[in-house]
Design a protein with these regions (language model features):
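Catalytic cores of phosphodiester-bond hydrolases, prominently lipid phosphodiesterases
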Residues: 1-241
Length: 241
């Protein structure tokens, strides 16, 4: 973890207007608990408030620039529940929906598509459909950019962060390994973004057209970055408002 964070910090030093979202969960056997993990992260890693955003809420991009934004998929120690004026420590995604087509964390902060158990090749089409549906849900959101909003207005208009996983696998079927799935999912999502994204049958966009966070697999393979270009391009349209 230390080596990974060193690379993240180096990236942020070189690109101070960017942000990096880090999602962490505890896995594996042993006697360690979520609470142990939370204390280790707080004490030894997420120590610099100028570099880490660890409030239990979704930040604005301005707040997040040049910082690591921590999403925790684990419970926290009782001592950390008092952090941030009693709101808790880090963005709460403890109740992360498992293997879901459309799920919302109990905190309401994150809406996720993470259907990953592709048991056979015919299920890859289901994965593509679920990913496209999540893109459509994200596209419908509208960000209020009026400058005279109060904090209460911002909170009332808040919507969850959309997280959309394109990755999936089945270890026991070689034709459902991550690279094979990506070879079908990625071109399909590129096609969706180019021809259908935020374009309903009426021809009028329904929202801002943002894609949300799209977690990709095998991007840049053999120099093909079209998927990333499409995602960045769709989100960049917000700059024209």
């Amino acid at each position: 973890l230390r080596g990974l964070l060193d690379k993240i910090h180096a990236f942020l030093d070189a690109n101070p207007t960017e942000t990096v979202i880090v999602s962490i969960k505890r896995e594996g056997i042993g006697n360690a608990t979520d609470q142990h993990l939370s204390k280790i992260l707080k004490t030894h890693y997420a120590t610099d408030r100028d570099r880490w955003f660890t409030d239990n809420r979704i930040p604005t991009l301005g707040e997040a620039r040049n910082k690591v934004v921590l999403i925790r998929r684990f419970a926290i120690d009782e001592s950390l529940e008092k952090e941030n004026d009693g709101a808790g420590w880090a963005i709460d995604a403890e109740s992360w929906p498992d293997n879901c087509a459309d799920g919302i964390c109990s905190s309401g902060e994150i809406r996720v598509q993470d259907f990953y158990e592709v048991t056979a090749t015919h299920n890859i089409s289901k994965k593509i459909t679920f990913a496209a549906e999540q893109l459509a849900r994200s596209a419908k959101t509208v960000c209020d950019l009026s400058k005279d909003q109060t904090a209460a207005d911002v909170e009332a208009a808040k919507f969850p962060v959309f997280v959309n996983f394109l990755s999936a696998s089945n270890f026991w079927r070689a034709n459902c390994w991550p690279d094979k799935i990506a070879a079908k999912v990625n071109p399909s999502i590129i096609d969706h973004l180019c021809r259908k994204h935020n374009e309903p049958s009426t021809g009028k966009p329904t929202g801002d057209g943002s894609t949300g966070i799209v977690v990709c697999d095998w991007v840049g393979h053999e120099g093909d970055w079209d998927l990333v270009r499409c995602i960045v391009g769709m989100n960049a349209k917000l700059e024209t408002r």
